[in-house]
């Protein structure tokens, strides 16, 4: 799929991976609806110009997600792509000093990372399926964001790893099911990236994390995630796969 003049919805777009992805799509000639729970998404969209619009929405809420998809259709007239970057992290042991892992905290992480991702996927797929196919029969592409924690989950990451493993596991069956509509589904599983989630860490901790990456020995850059998202969109043979973007990092147990 060519990006030029196509319409994309990017979640988690106020900062980090989502913001970089939205910027990259705009630079490639796309039109982007930026979605985030943070009100800053509106200012972010304004920075990107007339082909961008920001909408505040909770992706795990059915009505809010429907409004976001509707906003893309109303603003730009179609929907050709979804990049799900919205997500949260959290650390809690299955059995810690204060007792077992809280169910509310587990539900929150799974609710946003997995259910929120699926919520946007199903609603975007509905909109894409109603659109006209291109010359190759393609109607849309959906890119979800998992994490290497889906495969190398560490101690204290039970909820986060489970949520991201769910996103990874969703990829192939969704791709197979949506193939009849000409809609592709892919997932990127990033390693450790320079995002606002890392901002609270000391320089010493950041350097230690970077040293654990075989090559390049540094943290990933959001624009590198955005570049892979763009390639996935443009390469129609990429479908039903999870791509690790991690510099060959394999996380230890703790």
PLM features: residue spans?
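Canonical Rossmann dinucleotide-binding motif of NAD(H)/NADP(H)-dependent dehydrogenases/reductases
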Residues: 3-33
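The beta1-alpha1 cofactor-binding region of Rossmann-like NAD(H)/NADP(H)-dependent oxidoreductases
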Residues: 56-68, 103
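Catalytic Tyr-X3-Lys loop
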Residues: 88, 99-119, 143, 167
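Conserved mid-core segment of classical short-chain dehydrogenase/reductases
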Residues: 88-107, 126, 130-136, 156-159, ...
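Active-site helix of classical SDR
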Residues: 121, 163, 171
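Alpha-helical segment proximal to the catalytic Tyr-Lys
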Residues: 126, 175-177
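Residue(s) in the substrate-gating loop at a strand-loop-helix junction
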Residues: 147
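C-terminal substrate-recognition "lid" of short-chain dehydrogenase/reductases
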Residues: 221-245, 250
